[in-house]
């Protein structure tokens, strides 16, 4: 069952102060998503980051495109406060606004690049969110999105039990591609990435999951005990326990006027598998 937006915002509010300490996966996924811009002859004038969290990727986007207007949006007041406090001399370099990724408070066709690193995973209406990203893009604008895939934390699903991350949207790569085309994007190029993290013990793993809003109650006693028992099977030679993260990501262009733009409730499109480019890497 999807997590209601208000509950997600409150969850991120609670962990805002310690988020950056537990966001190693998010940071690596963001780095890989930005790499999709390498080699492109593309100079956006206006950039939106959906789910800007602590603002670090707004800074990275501004550094990459210093002449562009950069706007960071997040639904969590706590996260926005952290982003503002960490902005420092960047204050005049990028803007921060509060809003829902499925109902963007922005005009049609006002952005050249929309960037969303893992943030759409927490939106209960992902197809509507993708349609919103399409709406605010100008023709020939680019969207870069990444989400957690269905095999994220696969080795821990049994131990997590009712505390599982099942309330988060976990599309496979084909589903993400189909959703992008239904939203009106042209010929998405998709990747599946795998990230492995290592933790000193069960408590360290749960602390990272809680500190990145993937578990609402990482301190639950029965959860700690279940993860401790499972960790014996997942310990490497150095004595650390591992976790696997699947990241599905895409880049896609907004078509020129005259080509159809479809909302989540619009016309169904059948997509031949050979029309969706998929790459896999570790």
Q: Predicted segment positions?
A:
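N-terminal, positively charged/glycine-rich alpha-helical extensions of SAM-dependent methyltransferases
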Residues: 1-18, 277, 282
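Conserved alpha-helix/loop element of class I SAM-dependent methyltransferases that forms part
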Residues: 24-45, 60
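Class I SAM-dependent methyltransferase SAM/SAH-binding core
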Residues: 46-104
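A short acidic, Gly/Pro-enriched loop at the edge of an enzyme's catalytic core
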Residues: 102-113
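A short SAM/SAH-binding and catalytic strip from SAM-dependent methyltransferases
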Residues: 112-125
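A short glycine-rich, Lys/Arg-flanked "PGG" loop and its adjoining helix->strand segment in the class I
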Residues: 127-139
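Conserved catalytic/acceptor-binding region of the Class I
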Residues: 140-202, 212-225
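Conserved Class I S-adenosyl-L-methionine
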Residues: 189-282
């Amino acid at each position: 069952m999807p997590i209601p937006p208000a509950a997600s915002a409150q969850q991120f509010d609670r962990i805002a102060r310690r988020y950056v300490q537990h966001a190693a996966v998010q940071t690596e996924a963001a780095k890989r998503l930005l790499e999709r811009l390498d080699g492109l002859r593309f100079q956006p004038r206006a950039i939106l980051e959906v789910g800007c969290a602590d603002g670090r990727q707004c800074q990275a986007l501004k550094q990459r495109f210093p002449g562009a207007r950069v706007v960071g949006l997040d639904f969590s007041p706590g996260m926005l406060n952290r982003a503002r406090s960490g902005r420092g001399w960047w204050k005049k370099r990028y803007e921060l606004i509060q809003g829902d990724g499925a109902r963007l408070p922005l005009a049609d066709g006002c952005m050249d690049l929309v960037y969303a690193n893992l943030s759409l995973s927490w939106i209960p209406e992902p197809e509507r969110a993708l349609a919103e990203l399409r709406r605010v893009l100008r023709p020939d604008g680019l969207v870069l999105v990444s989400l957690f895939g269905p095999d994220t934390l696969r080795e821990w699903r049994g131990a997590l039990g009712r505390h599982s991350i099942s309330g988060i949207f976990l599309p496979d790569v084909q589903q993400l591609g189909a959703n992008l085309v239904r939203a009106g994007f042209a010929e998405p190029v998709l990747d599946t990435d795998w990230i492995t993290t290592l933790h000193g013990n069960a408590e360290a793993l749960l602390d990272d999951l809680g500190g990145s809003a993937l578990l609402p109650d990482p301190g639950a006693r029965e959860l700690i005990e279940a993860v401790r028992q499972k960790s014996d099977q997942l310990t490497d030679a150095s004595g650390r326990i591992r976790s696997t993260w699947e990241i599905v990501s895409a880049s896609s262009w907004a078509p020129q006027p005259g080509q159809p733009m479809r909302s989540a409730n619009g016309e169904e499109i059948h997509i031949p598998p050979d029309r969706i480019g998929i790459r896999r890497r570790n």
